[in-house]
Amino acid sequence: MEQLNQINLPKVDSTNTFVRDMLDSGGVLPGITIVTADEQTAGRGQTGNSWESEKGKNIIFSLLCHPDFIVPPKQFILSQCMALAVQQVLSKHIADAGKEDVVSIKWPNDIYVGDKKICGTLIECDLMGKSISNCIIGTGINVNQMVFTSDAPNPVSLKQIIDADSDCDAMIREVVDLFC
């Protein structure tokens, strides 16, 4: 695996925006960089949607990688890899709690348990010639939040499913290990 750098922020507008600003200022670290946050004030989703996350309750991270071996028409593979990693981790935690809820992927970027959304991913890639120079993969997973106040139609958290708190830091490591 490539060098893995981690930046933990107590509060940020958006982890994807933070990584984008880091790229724009030339502050890129070698290898893979993961930016996590306890609180995100302007989390973004697809088509301008926002992502709600109660402070310290959920997984919020952006992973920056440099997949220059992937040609732009094949960039969907990055979304597939992240979705499969999240699906596998959530399925394991649900099964370990003795529950039988099915975790499914709604392509290209959402993870559902039953008919409720537990995770969303926003991917932003930079192209250079015929390859992808940078890819920011922002992921939000509802882990320990119990009340959702936004107008999102169907959110759910892992805690609502398994009736127990989960360790967000450990889950991030599980997802990243599977993705990388």
Language model features: what each stretch is:
Residues 6, 68-102, 113-180:
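Long, positively charged amphipathic alpha-helical accessory segments at protein N-termini or as interdomain linkers
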